[in-house]
Curated annotation (Swiss-Prot):
This is Transcription factor Sp5. SMART domains: ZnF_C2H2 (SM00355). One of its GO terms (biological process) is bone morphogenesis. The 9aaTAD motif is a transactivation domain present in a large number of yeast and animal transcription factors. Residues 160-215 are annotated as: Disordered. SUPFAM superfamilies: beta-beta-alpha zinc fingers. GO terms for cellular component: nucleus. It is found in: Nucleus. Residues 163-174 have a biased composition (Pro residues). CDD domains: SP5_N. GO terms for molecular function: DNA binding; DNA-binding transcription repressor activity, RNA polymerase II-specific; RNA polymerase II transcription regulatory region sequence-specific DNA binding; sequence-specific DNA binding; zinc ion binding. It comes from Mus musculus.
Length: 398
């Protein structure tokens, strides 16, 4: 009811001020309407006694009636009025409403002035003044305050919890000491052997780099240049951007580190030992007979087939075990094969590809063995023609 009374009082005051002598020169100076308007204007003053039927509250422009958006008054309006406005625009005769603080606001309720409205909305329609629906969920004690985006505005002590807490600083990068390397007999086949490595050193380069940057009490296992190169590599892995001076400082160390990795990468490629009887009998040493080509024998009893490559022997062993890991993914097919070339040959039956062409007649075939049979037909024809020619020459010679 108090809000309705304030709205009615505001509308009545606007209606009466439109008919004051300053706005209507035809009315007399001491007319009853002028006296009533002066009495109503003193209601909001600090020293005046408020009417018992109305609740004295600070003036809020957002509660004004739509008629308060336009004020076609003259410039001689008294400035002591609480609703005093600046002179109207000379061309339009319309004056936008200004934001001001009421005397009834206490020191604890003083808020920073709201920013000026957007030029495209001059009549108090800025998004700062018109609160969105999400502000209704805030408690009544939280008054809206304007905080600019570019500046760090100071908030009252009671509103500091509205801002999000600052992010914690990132932890400093630390290098952890890795576990010691296993014994040389337990090293996997992909490990990298290093000359002069102690029992506590690992064959993997990353382990040595991590141990080098671990710091005391462990002594570094690389010289000072390699340790600096490791620090530069760690900085690059963390995503840091090196400046011109930093890049010039670490450039030589990075180049030295890359040069030391080149011979290690050459020895990193090693094959798993073949478990065929021939390789097991020879002790797995390929340099025992360098002039002889190494052969891999099938260890299944009663087979004894020999292959020149370990991949061929593995494919043959899959034939013994019945394993078919290569499956056709064509729709409604699902056939499986022991070897990958068998699967590729089967896929040509689905696609219709004929990649083998006859050099004599140009006829194409899906399989190479079919082409070989077709080429033999051409060779047989040539032999028959040659034999027929020889038989014809023999009667003439007689």
């Amino acid at each position: 009811m108090a809000a309705v009374a304030v709205l009615r009082n505001d509308s009545l005051q606007a209606f009466l001020q439109d008919r004051t002598p300053s706005a209507s020169p035809d009315l007399g100076k001491h007319s009853p309407l002028a006296l009533l308007a002066a009495t109503c204007s003193r209601i909001g003053q600090p020293g005046a006694a408020a009417a018992p039927d109305f609740l004295q509250v600070p003036y809020d422009p957002a509660l004004g009636s739509p008629s308060r958006l336009f004020h076609p008054w003259t410039a001689d309006m008294p400035a002591h009025s609480p609703g005093a406005l600046p002179p109207p625009h000379p061309s339009l005769g319309l004056t936008p409403q200004k934001t001001h603080l009421q005397p009834s606001f206490g020191a604890a309720h003083e808020l920073p002035l709201t920013p000026p409205a957007d030029p495209s909305y001059p009549y108090e329609f800025s998004p700062v003044k018109m609160l969105p629906s999400s502000m209704a969920a805030l408690p009544a004690s939280c008054a809206p305050a304007y905080v600019p985006y570019a500046a760090q505005a100071a908030l009252p002590p009671g509103y500091s919890n509205l801002l999000p807490p600052p992010p914690p600083p990132p932890p400093p990068p630390t290098c952890r000491q890795l576990s010691p390397a296993p014994a040389p007999d337990d090293l996997p086949w992909w490990s990298i052997p290093q000359s002069g490595a102690g029992p506590g050193s690992s064959g993997v380069p990353g382990t040595s780099l991590s141990s080098a940057c671990a710091g005391p009490p462990h002594a570094p296992r690389f010289p000072a240049s390699a340790a600096a190169a490791a620090a530069a590599a760690a900085a690059l892995q963390r995503g840091l951007v090196l400046g011109p001076s930093d890049f010039a400082q670490y450039q030589s160390q990075i180049a030295a580190l890359l040069q030391t990795k080149a011979p290690l990468a050459a020895t990193a490629r090693r094959c798993r030992r073949c478990r065929c009887p021939n390789c097991q009998a020879a002790g797995g040493a390929p340099e025992a007979e360098p002039g002889k080509k190494k052969q891999h024998v099938c260890h299944v009893p009663g087979c004894g087939k020999v292959y020149g490559k370990t991949s061929h022997l593995k494919a043959h062993l899959r034939w013994h075990t019945g394993e078919r890991p290569f499956v056709c993914n064509w729709l409604f097919c699902g056939k499986s094969f022991t070897r990958s070339d068998e699967l590729q040959r089967h896929l040509r039956t689905h696609t219709g590809e004929k990649r083998f062409a006859c050099p004599e007649c140009g006829k194409r075939f899906m399989r190479s063995d079919h082409l070989a049979k077709h080429v033999k037909t051409h060779q047989n024809k040539k032999l028959k023609v040659a034999e027929a020619g020889v038989k014809r020459e023999n009667p003439r010679d007689l």
